[in-house]
Amino acid sequence: MFALGTIVNTLAILGGGVFGALFGKMLGPRQQETLTRTCGVCSMFIGLSGTLEEMLSVQDGHIVTSGSLLMIICLAIGALIGEMLNLEGAFERFGTWLKVKTGNAKDQRFVDGFVTASLTVCIGAMAIVGSIQDGIQGDPSILLAKSVLDLIIIAVMTCSMGKGCVFSAIPVAVLQGSVTCLSRLIQPIMTEAALSNLSLVGSVMIFCVGVNLVWDKRIRVANLLPAIVIAVVAAFLPF
């Protein structure tokens, strides 16, 4: 079946979200707050581990770092572009529209839950590489593995942040479905260097999502999204 990985991933997010919404009703405000902070700490460590994996290497028995300047440039330029386009505002407006259309107008956490969950499950190399592999080879194995992770993540996030997290299935379906359909065009661009850059910058953004969950919303992470495109382009520049 074409785009099987994306279909399963979308259903996994919906399933995890429904389970989380039902279980979340049994939790009090204190438990929900603690669970949100816990999700944030986990996201921070996942982002940190992904960042260090791309930045650290062993040469001649010594640990060396690389990619620091690339990371700074990509995130700085990406942030400027994102702020000018106000991508965070676009996410929030779509979340507000969804909140009204789905009958959740009184849910004050809906938009934050939608934006945070969407960024968490969309950012990362697994979504891109898995979609390309599914489109070209018909092998959904990477996206199936991602589906298991996303099911757990969204179930936990929905418990603490509400039903808005369930609708993160929409951007996942759009992003991964689009990449799968365009996989033959995208594959030559996603070289090893491009994927490494994407993973580095994406991991930093996942860390930022965790920071927002732990210390309330302080970083407009969606406005950093152009940094991912810049990171991929940077892989083809002669420096």
Task: Name each region found by the language model.
Residues 8-16, 20, 24, 40-41, ...:
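Alpha-helical transmembrane segments in multi-pass membrane proteins
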Residues 2-15, 66-73, 135-147, 190-204:
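Structural signature of hydrophobic alpha-helical transmembrane segments
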Residues 39-55:
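A generic, lipid-embedded transmembrane alpha helix
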Residues 99, 108-187:
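Helix-loop-helix junctions within the multi-pass membrane cores of secondary transporters/permeases
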